[in-house]
């Protein structure tokens, strides 16, 4: 399946919303906005968000022959579960991200916000998505959202965090539904 740039961009935006929400929290915890912190946050989150779908893609291509008959269902289920979880998290209590900025914390936060990208990478393998442009778009989009999230969190505060996760969840569910409907022949 050829996935267009718009579809890849929408998936990239959906995936970047967890990182965006955490970046907003980082910005909230800062007394004064630091562009260095925003840049490092964007690089960590964008880098991990690009790496994880690549790993998922490599795993998916390895096992593709075993599950080709149900790949569209797997894509639909994975994207929907990720999306539903993001929507659920958008309605829950706010997590406080401490104003700590060290390598260990950044790696943990980067992994936590990019686990769903691993599952998306697996679906990319089943859909034969050209992985280099896909991970590039995901990484750059997440970098930009994370960089801006630190600034937005520092300036505006908590009100955007839940909305970002809700929007990201809805986008991923819609993309999963689109993939399923295409494979079932309901969409051209």
UniProtKB/Swiss-Prot annotation:
Transmembrane segments: 2-22, 39-59, 67-87, 107-127, 129-149, 166-186
Gene Ontology molecular function, alphabetical: manganese ion transmembrane transporter activity
Alphabetic keyword roster: Cell membrane, Ion transport, Manganese, Membrane, Transmembrane, Transmembrane helix, Transport
Protein topology in the membrane: Multi-pass membrane protein
Compartment annotation: Cell membrane
Any single Pfam family the record assigns to this protein: Mntp
One cellular component (GO) term of this entry: plasma membrane
Protein family according to the UniProt entry: Belongs to the MntP (TC 9.B.29) family.
PANTHER family: MANGANESE EFFLUX PUMP MNTP-RELATED (PTHR35529:SF1)
Record HAMAP family: MntP_pump
Function summary: Probably functions as a manganese efflux pump.
Protein name: Putative manganese efflux pump MntP
Biological source species: Desulfitobacterium hafniense (strain Y51)
Gene of this entry: mntP
């Amino acid at each position: 399946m050829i996935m267009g740039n718009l579809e890849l961009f929408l998936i990239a935006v959906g995936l970047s919303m967890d990182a965006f929400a955490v970046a907003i929290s980082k910005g909230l915890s800062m007394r004064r906005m630091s562009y260095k912190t925003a840049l490092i946050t964007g690089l960590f989150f964008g880098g991990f968000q690009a790496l994880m779908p690549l790993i998922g893609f490599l795993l998916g291509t390895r096992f593709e022959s075993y599950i080709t008959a149900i790949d569209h269902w797997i894509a639909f289920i994975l994207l929907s579960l990720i999306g539903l979880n993001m929507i659920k998290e958008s309605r829950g209590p706010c997590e406080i991200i401490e104003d700590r900025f060290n390598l260990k914390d950044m790696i943990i936060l980067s992994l936590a916000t990019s686990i769903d990208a691993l599952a998306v990478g697996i679906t990319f393998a089943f859909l034969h998505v050209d992985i280099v442009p896909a991970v590039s778009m995901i990484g750059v989009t997440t970098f930009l959202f994370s960089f801006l999230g630190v600034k937005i969190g520092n300036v505006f505060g908590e009100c955007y965090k839940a909305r970002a996760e809700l929007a990201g969840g809805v986008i991923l569910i819609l993309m999963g539904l689109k993939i399923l409907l295409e494979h079932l022949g309901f969409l051209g």
